[in-house]
């Protein structure tokens, strides 16, 4: 069996303020065999140009009119997925560096896999980001 590929579906709409942090968190992953599929709902800000500026072949961007239904964006993204596993990441979220490696270890130990986990909620305040932990 070849190296496992993760397809990461990222719905976006006017996410220019957050999309860099989201994509940068993927570029920092300790496991590098992934593809990011950004599905943009015709943003009116710089979201699409920011995504395209990365110039990394693993990061793709497609447009959709999802009529405000984010599930349409996720389902559309799945049609482009080439990976062995599909992951969802919102454009205003980011992952810790070992996220995919941790998922891979679990996938290798279990035949049928659906992974979910807790999250940390961060809010921006005057002195930076603060966690709910």
List each language-model region with its residue ranges.
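Nucleotide-sugar donor-binding/catalytic module of glycosyltransferases
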Residues: 1-133
């Amino acid at each position: 069996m070849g190296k496992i590929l993760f397809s990461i579906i990222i719905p976006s709409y006017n996410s220019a303020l957050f999309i860099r942090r989201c994509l940068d968190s993927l570029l920092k992953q300790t496991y590098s065999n992934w593809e990011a599929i950004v599905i943009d709902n015709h943003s009116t800000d710089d979201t699409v140009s920011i995504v395209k500026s990365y110039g990394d072949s693993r990061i793709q961007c497609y447009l959709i009119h999802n009529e405000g239904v984010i599930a349409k964006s996720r389902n559309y993204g799945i049609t482009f997925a080439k990976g062995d596993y599909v992951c969802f990441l919102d454009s205003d979220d980011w992952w810790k560096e070992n996220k995919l490696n941790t998922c891979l270890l679990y996938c290798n130990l279990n035949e049928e896999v659906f992974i979910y986990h807790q999250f940390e909620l961060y809010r921006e305040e005057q002195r930076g980001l603060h966690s709910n932990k």
